[in-house]
Amino acid sequence: MSPRHERELENFAARVRACRICVENPVGQPLPHEPRPVLRPSSSARILIASQAPGTKVHMSGMPFTDASGDRLRDWLAVSSDEFYDTTKFAIVPMGFCFPGQDAKGGDLPPRRECAAAWRAPLMALMPRIDLVLTIGLYAQSWHMGAARRPSLTETVMDWRTIWDAPSTPKVLPLPHPSWRNTGWLKRNPWFEMDLLPFLRSEIRFRLG
């Protein structure tokens, strides 16, 4: 990409990082803490990690996936931390940019709806080299896959070959969230590690060169 395009993305990302929509003009209840948008867009990366929203550790660090979920995701991708955080290789743009808070049971709330509505389409337009989108969880799958998303996350991920073979650009691979909460899901669905992960790793390595 040209320096002009890089500057345009940098300027737009700076606007996102200064966003306060969920406090000043929220949909429903306002964000219960000070916003701290976390994203790593890229004008040169070919791979987009479309995740859900930061958790508590990421809210503190200001870097995506600096937690156990990140360790598991990097293992799924078979990449090092240096590769993962290299913005010439990966763009990381969650559906919600700020930690949304927790529910009464201690689980993270869904991504804030304001983020995608305000920012996602123009961000995608500024990342034209993306040719593989890893949709992590239902919210990313709904936005990036539309009608191609199946009724449940399990059905969507299970049907990854059909989704991959569809004539769409960029290519999409649906994934569950790498949270420890999904360890049981992984045990109940051994095909994920046996079939999908080897294919995913080969596509990642192909794009990283």
Model-derived features with residue positions:
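A polyanion-binding, active-site-adjacent surface
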Residues: 2-208
